[in-house]
Amino acid sequence: PEYRRVIQDLFMEYSDAVSKNEFDYGHTTAIQCQIQLKLGEEEPVKLKSRPLNPAQEASLKEQLAEWEKSGIIEKTQSPWAFPMVGVKKKDSDKLRWCVDYRLLNKKTVKDAYPLSSIESNLHKLQGAKIFSTLDSAGAYHAVEIHPESRECTAFTTPFGQFQFVRMPFGLSNAGACYSRLVALALQYLPGHFALAYLDDIVIFSDNISEHVKELRQVLDVHRQFGMKLKLSKCKVLQEQVEYLGHLVSEDGIRMVPSYVNKILEWPLPQTGKQLKQFLGFIGYYRGFIPDVAELTSEMNEMKKSAKVTWTPGTEEKFRKLKEKFSESPVRSYPDYKSEEPFILDTDFSSTSLAAVLSQRQNGEEKFIGAGARKCNKAEQNYPSHKGELAAVVMGLRKFEHILRYKPFILRTDSRCVQFLNSLKEVSGIYARWLNFIQGFQFEVVHRPGAKKQNAYALSRTEHDGDSEHVREEELDQEEDVYAVTDSEVEHWLVRNACKSK
């Protein structure tokens, strides 16, 4: 309460960095979005407008008028034309209008600017006690489209043809372009107290007084770069906030209760498509549930059928899966300053590779994260020592950002690393693995699989994913051990932004 007036005064001072209405998007001149077409793909695409009912036409007409008034779009005679799509907003009957740019995206050279890692961002919150999350108003619409690229964004409507002056949702490079803008803005901050993923910004501090100062600095860069915040979506001075689909606090990382409730209330799928949707939804959180793969192994086969046939056994696993999510563990943050080493458990079975990362914190071994993947055909025939090495490499790659520069304990139920070091001549995949492993500092602790419950259980289950047709020389390449990739998360975040904003 004592800081409420301070925060109110702060946002009043930076009122020019706060959106005044739903069409006040801000305007940056720091960067522009340029669409580069692939060589030989310069031929314009011209598609017809899709049929709309009277209510949809009225909604679209209103949207176009507001966009044109705000300088987001302009009339055009472009040879390009794409259809509009109305997306129902979250918890509302209103429509949010987007353009179907799928054919344009196929012709576009992809921007190589990397998105920040979700896992890395979450781990950087370690030690923080106070959080604020900031939501950008319109986000992409603050960025100009390069004049030479505007005609490529043209769209057709019953009210004429228009093109975007500002960057719209739906362009394949929009996320990378906006991420570049936010990174450019945040790099001027004198410290590491703010993180961004697309338009989701979190400020984290260990006390309130410092947090208020840091919030001021973030508001200042928003002012300097012409970006605006949607105040109704900002959460300030919180001990716990939702960030990137997770609930974060001083204690650790949790699943968002509303998402867990959706899982618990999910009806029994009757078609393969419905089952695939369910498995995809829970996949975002599979790093919290070590035995999720065991419970979903049969479902991953069932989803391939048009109609799903449930047995008492598979229906019971579906029920147990929901229970597991209601009892999900808290993932602790990796403590880089602690003298306690990280502990990496790895294991191999004929079906899977598995790894679990933990660390002793406050006298207890705390769970930080887990990963597992299905073995491909070649790996299924590996002898024990080679399979264990494959699991070690997989685990090191998964948690490389944590383990690379800090000594840790490697617990495995085989003398695999000693075997690798004992080889007089090393070539092929062993040479690549050895070269990679030698970049880490660790102590090997032999531990039987029966005592190593986390990684052992993970590797003894079947994991979804197509791992066939992998050549021997490709087996050492990095693989994503979680069900959802960053690019899928970007799509998920943008899709939800379309529905909610």
Language model: regions and residue ranges:
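Conserved pre-motif C helix in the palm subdomain of viral-like polymerases
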Residues: A58, Q126-K129, Y140, F159-H192, ...
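Active-site palm subdomain of RNA-directed nucleic acid polymerases
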Residues: N21-Y25, K69-K75, G175-Q217, F288-V292, ...
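RNase H catalytic domain
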Residues: P383, V393-G449
